Amino acid sequence: MARLFSPRPPPSEDLFYETYYSLSQQYPLLILLLVIVLCAIVALPAVAWASGRELTSDPSFLTTVLCALGGFSLLLGLASREQQLQRWTRPLSGLIWAALLALGYGFLFTGGVVSAWDQVSFFLFIIFTVYAMLPLGMRDAAAAGVISSLSHLLVLGLYLGWRPESQRDLLPQLAANAVLFLCGNVVGAYHKALMERALRATFREALSSLHSRRRLDTEKKHQEHLLLSILPAYLAREMKAEIMARLQAGQSSRPENTNNFHSLYVKRHQGVSVLYADIVGFTRLASECSPKELVLMLNELFGKFDQIAKEHECMRIKILGDCYYCVSGLPLSLPDHAINCVRMGLDMCRAIRKLRVATGVDINMRVGVHSGSVLCGVIGLQKWQYDVWSHDVTLANHMEAGGVPGRVHITGATLALLAGAYAVERADMEHRDPYLRELGEPTYLVIDPWAEEEDEKGTERGLLSSLEGHTMRPSLLMTRYLESWGAAKPFAHLSHVDSPASTSTPLPEKAFSPQWSLDRSRTPRGLHDELDTGDAKFFQVIEQLNSQKQWKQSKDFNLLTLYFREKEMEKQYRLSALPAFKYYAACTFLVFLSNFTIQMLVTTRPPALATTYSITFLLFLLLLFVCFSEHLTKCVQKGPKMLHWLPALSVLVATRPGLRVALGTATILLVFTMAVVSLLFLPVSSDCPFLAPNVSSVAFNTSWELPASLPLISIPYSMHCCVLGFLSCSLFLHMSFELKLLLLLLWLVASCSLFLHSHAWLSDCLIARLYQGSLGSRPGVLKEPKLMGAIYFFIFFFTLLVLARQNEYYCRLDFLWKKKLRQEREETETMENVLPAHVAPQLIGQNRRNEDLYHQSYECVCVLFASIPDFKEFYSESNINHEGLECLRLLNEIIADFDELLSKPKFSGVEKIKTIGSTYMAATGLNATPGQDTQQDAERSCSHLGTMVEFAVALGSKLGVINKHSFNNFRLRVGLNHGPVVAGVIGAQKPQYDIWGNTVNVASRMESTGVLGKIQVTEETARALQSLGYTCYSRGVIKVKGKGQLCTYFLNTDLTRTGSPSAS
């Protein structure tokens, strides 16, 4: 609570919060002054009509009201000027408070006999408005409220204490006044504290939303570039539209549709050519590179290939290690797609040939091209990558594998489309791989017409480079040469356009500098000229938060009812939880206790009254017990189980709006009833001895005593208790405006009926008694309890009605800003579907450190390759399955189900890298802090291997469920390996996150040489898993391509059934 009572404004938000607070308090201040002015205007004719008096019969009342009308009209004019209000906030507030005090003492000491109960309600009005409607800080408001209370008590105590006729019952009345003022101060401070907290929360939500919106506007542009760089425009639009629809509908990752499949973004294209290219000799070269050199080398090479692809109207599909493949004829059909791919292949070979000649490094390019049809699109839910599938794609892959280094290897289908543009020669049978040999179709090698000329030109340069190479590592020499190509870095094009670093600062730095302070005589509109565009937007938002906006047309709110225009948002607002309800109830209980104390001080305390208060007291205790029962959790847990449900009661009240409304309404009605309960035990009419005609006042003074059943002094205090009843309605800040209007109107009618009709004779009797010694004299208008009460009832009614609407507006505004901020944050989902969460901030956004390529080396990463070899046999292209589309639909289900495992907390450390056909690649240990592994022992640093094993088993379980529903018998073949890797992002046109290293290569070999239903690991990984409690058994020594003879192990688990791996 200490924060709630801190002086305004907080230093860290000095400029914007000062302006915002002034604007938010201007409206209630204007309403306060307007109510006083209108009451002064209406009071004169209304009182004359109601009392049947001439206005001139009460000159003191007429003079006081006219002076108040003139003074407060002047103050209204000053407060309505925004410039003056911002410049003279505290002096103007102090002047209004002093004017109200002067008016109160004017009413007190004019118009007749001064009594202890006189003008208590008006001073209560002053106290409450100081807190709720004047733009003062909490400390200033509390000081004004306490001074107002003490001044009334001291002035009347001193004035009446010296008058013998007034000393009777003086102390109980002053004590009752003190209770009233104390309750008024507490209620006012409570109301101000909650409103300031709500205002501060709304202010921060608005600025956070603006900050987020500005940042997201930039990030959306970046995401648009990113999506369009990895996906064709039509597919990016389609996927983005569905994501936004899913977010708006609040659905899960799997949208509800007529079938139970995930959305499939795959289409068939005919008349395309597919190019596969592999850098021969790169694996050996990469083993000599540092992480930075490796990522730079790959980015330069593939960046150059991307430039060549763009020149020849080809689309890069994916990078697989050092393998590059692209397609021509996507997404738009091109008649020259075969020629485009062949030209690109030749240019790639020339680029590598120049590199080899210039550096002397023994690398080459092997290219394969085939023409046909493909299925293209995106599968899975995470780490989207545009891909192509078909038998023709498989054939193009084998064309590269069975090709010749430095040559472009094409099929007969591609040759037919070249139409003689290039000379070719038959490829020898010895170059064919088993797949091509089994196919039996002739293949061809394209003859490069420029190869001989380039070899002659490059001879001298090659000799020079070879001399330099004697003093430099081949990898370093190659890196130096590749830098001259100047390939663009990933996301470089995003860092120069609307950089978030320059546009997303939440508050301008100059707002906090001592040299730049707010001249409060200037309005926000005047400041617009001094501030830049970004700062001016903050003031625009602040002006939108002004409570006067509730009376202007809005696209979010209904002008009259303040309901949200969107029915769904209105429903969400009304159903939102309200944990603060218990505090509303507690403060209302304080009002009830104040009423009880006052009644005990000024009434004769009949038994019926005590019984009524006892029952009500028990009902309040029951309500508070229910509201605060969550704080009894520890106590209840130690008790019997039959009481464990008690803490859930407070949660039920906080989350059930219907129950809250019922309890709130019942609580307010109880306070209303108990405020006048003492009057309900009195007769509605009686013969008052003081009102008998022609009776000597001396006789009354000597022979008649007030009966105990007629406590006249309680009449004005019952009226004051009614005012507290009005205040109790303002304590429920989140209660709807229409319900507050209904309750306030009900209480206004009931109170006026009691004091002006059924029990008006009591007020007349009290006045007659006070003035019995002054025949012919009549009290002033505000000296009669019934008239005084009616006037103050109307004043409090209209004042609280205005505050209720303002509270409703700010509660709804706070809800609206929170919802907008939440929606804007949800829109960032796209980025995490392209890059790992720990990588994206370093490449895009305000956290981007520099223009260097992203690369990171890790000492211990576990890499998984999980393939479904049976899918290759399952895949077929026929009219029945729409040329393979339905087969891919099933693969999409499999990959999507695999992706859904990543959202489970236990697999939060698993990072999906990519999919390669029906092979799933993932890694653990990539989100560890770099360098952390070297500071810990091996067992602890590689503890995430167990997570990867559990993930592999979960993949098998998922596949088993799919088999059950699709009537298939797919089985996983999994390879695991752990060790050092290099991670990075390469490719400017299509940024792609990947990992490289011997660890990755061996993990891939563990999968390709594995056995269905088994997890194959290397000997080192087997030892690490055994230290974690897993059981492995030796498979023996097997031949692994590129690695020679390796001893491998199988993990003792069956991927075809669900369950955890066996642990020894």
From Swiss-Prot:
Textual note on the cofactor: Binds 2 magnesium ions per subunit. Is also active with manganese (in vitro).
Catalytic activity: ATP = 3',5'-cyclic AMP + diphosphate
Summary of the tissues where the protein is detected: Widely distributed.
GO cellular component: cytoplasm; dendrite; membrane; plasma membrane; protein-containing complex
Extracellular side: 685-707
Enzyme Commission designation: 4.6.1.1
Glycosylation sites: 694, 701
UniProt-listed Pfam families: AC_N (PF16214), Adcy_cons_dom (PF06327), Guanylate_cyc (PF00211)
Highest taxon, organism lineage: Eukaryota
Statement: the UniProt record of this protein carries the keyword Signal: no
InterPro entries per the UniProt record, alphabetical: A/G_cyclase, A/G_cyclase_CS, AC_N, Adcy, Adcy_conserved_dom, Nucleotide_cyclase
List of residues binding Mg(2+) 2: 278-279, 322
The entry's keywords: ATP-binding, cAMP biosynthesis, Cell membrane, Cytoplasm, Glycoprotein, Lyase, Magnesium, Membrane, Metal-binding, Nucleotide-binding, Phosphoprotein, Repeat, Transmembrane, Transmembrane helix
Binding, ATP: 278-283, 320-322, 366, 914, 994-996, 1001-1005, 1041
UniProt topology in membrane: Multi-pass membrane protein
EC top class, as a word: lyase
Places the protein is found: Cell membrane; Cytoplasm
Cofactor(s) for this UniProt protein: Mg(2+); Mn(2+)
Regulation of its function: Activated by forskolin. Insensitive to calcium/calmodulin. Stimulated by GNAS and by the G-protein beta and gamma subunit complex.
Entry's transmembrane regions: 29-50, 61-80, 94-117, 120-138, 141-162, 170-190, 583-604, 608-630, 661-684, 708-733, 741-761, 788-804
Presence of the UniProt keyword Cell membrane in the record: yes
Notes concerning its domains: The protein contains two modules with six transmembrane helices each; both are required for catalytic activity. Isolated N-terminal or C-terminal modules have no catalytic activity, but when they are brought together, enzyme activity is restored. The active site is at the interface of the two modules.
Function, as annotated: Catalyzes the formation of the signaling molecule cAMP in response to G-protein signaling.
Family in the record: Belongs to the adenylyl cyclase class-4/guanylyl cyclase family.
Protein name: Adenylate cyclase type 4
